[in-house]
Curated annotation (Swiss-Prot):
Function: This protein is one of the two subunits of integration host factor, a specific DNA-binding protein that functions in genetic recombination as well as in transcriptional and translational control.
Name of protein: Integration host factor subunit beta
Record lineage: Bacteria, Pseudomonadati, Pseudomonadota, Gammaproteobacteria, Enterobacterales
Organism: Buchnera aphidicola subsp. Schizaphis graminum (strain Sg)
Assigned protein family: Belongs to the bacterial histone-like protein family.
Pfam families: Bac_DNA_binding
């Protein structure tokens, strides 16, 4: 699902809220999550999940086109761990 599809789906469910407000709220939430992660903070949304950073140590990788070995530097990557309620909803049959 793209951001624009998300805006449309929310607008369908919440017809009393303008599309501009929905778009602004979603963009602001995503921006806040990005800024918080860039500062090394963890974001927990109860019932939905937790956004955090995971450390990856340096290692030797391989260029998929050439097969040449390259050194990959240490880095942090964004990580999302779904909460129990989200996991339960995803596995509901």
């Amino acid at each position: 699902m793209t951001k624009s599809e998300l805006f449309e789906r929310i607008a369908e469910r919440k017809a009393h809220i303008s599309n501009k407000i929905i778009e602004c709220a979603v963009k602001e939430m995503l921006e806040y999550i990005s800024i918080s992660l860039s500062k090394g903070k963890r974001i927990e949304i109860r019932g939905f999940g937790t956004f955090s950073l995971h450390y990856r140590s340096s290692r030797i990788g391989r260029n998929p086109k050439t097969g040449k070995k390259i050194k990959l530097n240490e880095r942090y990557i964004p990580y999302f761990k779904p909460g129990k309620q989200l996991r339960d909803r995803a596995n509901y049959k």
